[in-house]
Amino acid sequence: MHDIVIRSGKVVDGTGKAIQQMDIAIDNGLITAVGNDIGEGRTEIDASNHLVTPGFVDVHTHYDGQATWDPEMSPSSYHGVTTTVFGNCGVGFAPAQPDSHDWLIQLMEGVEDIPGAALAEGIEWNWETFPEYLDALEKMPRVMDIATQVPHGSVRAYAVSYTHLTLPTKRIV
């Protein structure tokens, strides 16, 4: 008996094949069977008249800060996203010298219009280097996978000192 069986869903498998009505078995959090006659589940979900798809990958997000405090990375997880990529647009929070935190928050706020107050309240800054940032992310519980690029703005601020850099203004952006 499977842990979960999703019954009679319109399965879109992501390969370009035609949509097929099938059942999906899940055991220990992993898909173990897709098809018909896959057996019973301890929990069964009727997906009749509903699409069932693989998780989506969002290749351009700005969860760099939010990923350090929000295990759901909402709202993306509510929309079927199972993997996010951040470090986009050159803005992010690692590497980060302790005296550059406010500057990096202002950069993210200015370029991406993410409220600086939310970032300042949420980010714990328990890293300085990029590998330490990855370690901090790894320790966080989360409902989706993450991938991150090294943001060039943070690298530049770390290497040259953020005090020599000018933040973009609303007029420039």
What do these predicted ranges mean?
Residues E44, D64, P95-A96:
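Short Asp/Glu-rich motifs
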Residues H164-V173:
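Single conserved hydrophobic/aromatic residue that forms the stacking wall/gate
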Residues V52-M73:
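Di-metal (Zn2+ and/or Mg2+/Mn2+) metal-binding site signature of metallo-dependent hydrolases
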